[in-house]
């Protein structure tokens, strides 16, 4: 949840140029589905926005099974936020887009958080309105390939070609990219190491191998290194302060954006395939019209 706020802070000068406001003057709305995923992201959004000094004007949870988000959207219309940080799944995510258009809700900056916003079903549901939506994901989608080793560039191109041939669409969403990247990492790094260390291939030997991994970002299609926290060295969340064991402390989140129905990495720069469009343009039904 913190990544979306970090991204906005990183482009503070551009925000000031367009909106005439410093980061501390931005009105931020945080809306999320009320399950464990949405709640965790929302808490991260809130903590990071609060730390950045932003004015949090809406902090609202809803059920992902809802058939009506009009009450939430009316609160947003009343609050007139500069930024909306939104987390949900496919059905509620597409419902939000549809009802926002019906009720006239617009916002200058909208950032979604993976989940249902980064899958083909969401694209199919909202059509062209998906374009220019920003989403925070655990992998860079359609990344700049020279960020990876030559070997991984070849592997990615082969994966993309085979997937596209079989399914008719590119693997341009976090689900496909993450599943392949993790499976490839397991079979090329974890499994061989487990057998080398113990002479066996088992759940226990794989666990030991995983905990001993220390890879840099160039060795993984995840766009991040691999080093897991242990009971002796737990990971402490820098935003929320929670202590975790078994977490990849090198993990990152990335900002992807839809262009012509496909997700492309736009931040951080070393993985960016396209330039980000921070403010929703007039072609979006959610655009507040601050840019053409």
Model-predicted segments: where are they?
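Extracellular/periplasmic catalytic domains that process cell-envelope and extracellular macromolecules
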Residues: 22-23, 77-79, 102-104, 125-129, ...
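Alpha-helix termini
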Residues: 16-24, 123, 167, 194-198
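A structural signal for well-ordered alpha-helical segments within the folded catalytic domains
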Residues: 6-9, 94, 177-188, 204, ...
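Extracellular/periplasmic Venus flytrap/periplasmic-binding protein
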Residues: 1-103, 147-150, 154
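Extracellular/periplasmic periplasmic-binding protein-like sensory domains
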Residues: 1, 100-182, 269-271, 282-290
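Flexible glycine/proline-enriched surface loops and loop-helix/loop-strand junctions
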Residues: 24-30, 81, 140, 165-172, ...
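Alpha-helical structural signal in soluble globular domains
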Residues: 44-52, 99-103, 121-125, 162, ...
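Segments of small-molecule ligand-sensing domains
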Residues: 163-176, 188-265
